[in-house]
């Protein structure tokens, strides 16, 4: 067979994932902290990028910059003709990125998606008055970022008053470093003695001293030991209590008959002992500051509109204010025209800066579209609560705003929405559908779980609902659900079975009678 060379002409199409397009996709799924860190790195590398201070006025503060009605689906007149992020990016791939972009903040984020600066006090008041946010009148940032001691600092302050020998303090310091956030000690005494070169008796003696520190229960190695330390501090660790603490697995199973036999007490005494146990803290270290926590900053703020609808706004605190300094580019370009290398570097910086600002603009528009559609779909939840949460999936939102499901998935990742009902992750609003028993509207799984939790919380000791009873009640309410699904939801919410709940409720009822 002879070998020969030949030419073949073939035409094909393929999608090329450019670095800029990959960057735009990554920006979509970044949360506020990740985006701030990424922009800080880009500003450090690119001399043409500037971050505008938050207190500096921008064009977004103009009077015509208003909130976004949820009924519009998050689209503006300017963005109505735009499609998906990917289509928009690919259609501009042949254009010069350095053209048509001013250093104006209006090109970074459109006016129609920015909230009024005058709304800030009202939004801040709403945010602080949310459940779990405390009293808005007494809000003080110092209560959250300063003034609180960690568990290790509190224990270290007690150390000089309890141990005088340097060797004992060394052992104590080692034990303090081995504590977890709950105050439990995860260190073997024999290994500790070998590691520190100390006698086993000294290690055990130091641990006994440390277990008398405040808060009571620290340096325990098991839950039973933690409770025993606290009972000893209350002078309540009698033989019956010791037997109860040593058999916590029976208490977890609500096997009160076996506990009465092991502890040698009657039912009345056992109820008193259980009431004493409930007063103890199983995790004594959690009441202390364990580190620096970052507050969750909502990306979207939803508030009631005067016409009865909802206003959806991007949170200005989560918006990166990035500008391109064209004046600096022009000035430097004049002095570097003779140097082709410097000019090429400046042109590349300008292209990267323009693409970044456009990507941030597109990111803001996309978040706005998705959030507005979620608010439109979950209007009943915002008005009535979790019981009216509708079943929703990514495809419904993607079809409504004419985007791909993957784009919606990236937008809802690690993004939060502040609503009159509280602060929620965007993914919270996407729940599976449970059919209706009467061929009506489907029910959200989250709303069904809420109904199950409410029914169990309202049951009495004489009328504890089994899983089959819950199924019957839900079917009467129009929810078609299987018993195994109810059991799965109940276990996911850490709710015990009806047998265990009946034992506990009867014991509590008898305790209340005494």
Swiss-Prot record:
The keyword DNA-binding applies. It comes from the Bacteria. A motif (RPON box) lies at residues 482-490. Residues 57-83 are annotated as: Disordered. GO terms for biological process: DNA-templated transcription initiation; nitrogen fixation. Residues 393-412 bind DNA. Keywords: DNA-binding, DNA-directed RNA polymerase, Nitrogen fixation, Nucleotidyltransferase, Sigma factor, Transcription, Transcription regulation, Transferase. InterPro entries: RNA_pol_sigma_54 (IPR000394), RNA_pol_sigma_54_core-bd (IPR007046), RNA_pol_sigma_54_DNA-bd (IPR007634), RpoN_core-bd_sf (IPR038709). One of its GO terms (molecular function) is DNA-binding transcription activator activity. GO terms for cellular component: DNA-directed RNA polymerase complex. Pfam families: Sigma54_AID (PF00309), Sigma54_CBD (PF04963), Sigma54_DBD (PF04552). PANTHER family: RNA POLYMERASE SIGMA-54 FACTOR (PTHR32248:SF4). Sigma factors are initiation factors that promote the attachment of RNA polymerase to specific initiation sites and are then released. This sigma factor is responsible for the expression of the nitrogen fixation genes (nif operon), glnA and dctA for dicarboxylate transport. The open complex (sigma-54 and core RNA polymerase) serves as the receptor for receipt of the melting signal from the remotely bound activator proteins NifA, NtrC, or DctD for the expression of the regulated proteins. Belongs to the sigma-54 factor family. This is RNA polymerase sigma-54 factor. It comes from Rhizobium meliloti (strain 1021).
């Amino acid at each position: 067979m002879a070998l020969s060379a030949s030419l073949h002409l073939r035409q094909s199409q393929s999608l090329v994932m450019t670095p800029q397009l990959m960057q735009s996709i990554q920006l979509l799924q970044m949360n506020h902290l990740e985006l701030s860190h990424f922009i800080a790195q880009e500003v450090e590398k690119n001399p043409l990028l500037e971050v505008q201070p938050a207190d500096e006025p921008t064009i977004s503060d103009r009077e015509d910059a208003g909130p976004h009605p949820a009924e519009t689906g998050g689209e503006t007149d300017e963005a109505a003709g735009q499609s998906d992020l990917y289509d928009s990016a690919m259609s501009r791939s042949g254009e010069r990125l350095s053209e048509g972009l001013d250093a104006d903040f209006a090109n970074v984020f459109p006016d129609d998606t920015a909230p009024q600066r005058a709304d800030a006090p009202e939004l801040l008041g709403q945010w602080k008055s949310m459940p779990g946010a405390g009293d808005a009148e007494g809000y003080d940032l110092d209560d959250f970022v300063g003034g609180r001691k960690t568990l290790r600092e509190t224990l270290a302050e007690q150390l000089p008053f309890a141990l005088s020998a340097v060797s004992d303090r060394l052992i104590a310091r080692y034990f303090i470093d081995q504590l977890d956030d709950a105050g439990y000690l995860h260190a073997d005494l024999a290994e500790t003695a070998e590691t520190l070169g100390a006698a086993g008796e000294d290690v055990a003696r130091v641990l006994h001293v440390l277990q008398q520190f405040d808060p009571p229960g620290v340096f325990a190695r098991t839950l039973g030991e933690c409770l025993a330390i606290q009972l000893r501090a209350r002078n309540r660790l009698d033989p019956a209590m010791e037997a109860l603490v040593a058999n916590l697995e029976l208490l977890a199973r609500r096997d009160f008959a076996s506990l009465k036999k092991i502890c040698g007490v009657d039912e009345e005494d056992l109820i008193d002992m259980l009431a004493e146990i409930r007063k103890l803290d199983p995790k004594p270290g959690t009441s202390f500051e364990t580190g620096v926590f970052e507050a969750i900053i909502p990306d979207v703020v939803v508030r009631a509109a005067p016409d009865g609808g909802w206003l959806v706004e991007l949170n200005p605190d989560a918006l990166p204010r990035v500008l391109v300094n064209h004046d600096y580019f022009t000035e430097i370009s004049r002095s570097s025209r003779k140097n082709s290398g410097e000019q090429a570097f400046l042109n590349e910086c300008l292209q990267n800066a323009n693409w970044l600002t456009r990507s941030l603009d597109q990111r803001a528009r996309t978040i706005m579209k998705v959030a507005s559609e979620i608010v439109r779909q979950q209007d009943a939840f915002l008005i009535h609560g979790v019981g009216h949460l509708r079943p929703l999936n990514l495809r419904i939102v993607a079809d409504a705003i004419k985007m791909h499901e993957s784009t919606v998935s990236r937008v809802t990742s690690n993004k939060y929405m502040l609503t009159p009902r509280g602060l929620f992750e965007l993914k919270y609003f996407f729940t599976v559908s449970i059919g209706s028993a009467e061929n009506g509207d489907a029910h959200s799984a989250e709303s069904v779980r809420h109904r199950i939790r409410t029914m169990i919380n309202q049951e009495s000791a004489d009328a504890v609902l089994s899983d089959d009873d819950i199924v019957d009640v839900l079917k009467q309410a129009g929810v078609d659900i299987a018993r195994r699904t109810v059991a799965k939801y109940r276990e996911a919410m850490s709710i015990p079975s009806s047998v265990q709940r009946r034992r506990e409720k009867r014991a509590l009822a008898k305790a209340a009678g005494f």
